[in-house]
């Protein structure tokens, strides 16, 4: 795993740039007790670096870091990293939002879709301990129409702009219908257009969104539906952007592979994967490259590294 320390420095600088007023001068969130030498920003940057290298196993990550002891003199233990990664998940999400606003602040057309996030095979669902003591956050059985299969886990809902930047997302039980996500975000957006698939088809929800926040929900008609109209081709083409994002997250960030034993750990991993995707898009943005070409974005990043 070459250049891990160099890539870490680049990502750390980006996180530091977008964390103003969120952390102190040492890169830590305000809290009581001993000030950690390995700062909260460094924990976030290390997690994002691992995700961008395709390393989603903490055990494998710390085995790789054995070669970089001189570059990380204050590196914490694996157990401390696991705990602090969960602790800093909200800070990581706030930094991601700041980056997304810098890339795509004036967007008024968004694509909405959902993606299954299985936590184990169907046969092992009853033995899965994820969420065993918290039913509200526990996984459930669901059905994916696109893949024509049942699964046990969660459902990732995402709202992205036409350029492919994720502005909002949420994780729900697999059994929750896609359309309920729109009720959660209708107060966050105003006077814009949402492009969805047939899973978001509902006249009552369309009317409610428009009356509440002047949001137009554009979905394709079913063939046997009353007052059928053909799909507007530019909308159909634009909506595929969110599907491309999900494909990239499954391929490069291994969204559907789960090592977490608790819900908070799984949620922290999802936040890291989406934040890593957003940072790669930001690197392409400042290099005037297509935002969707994230595979080799870090190789083209020539910004001077200040981390040491």
Residue positions per predicted region:
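Short alpha-helical elements
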Residues: 1-308
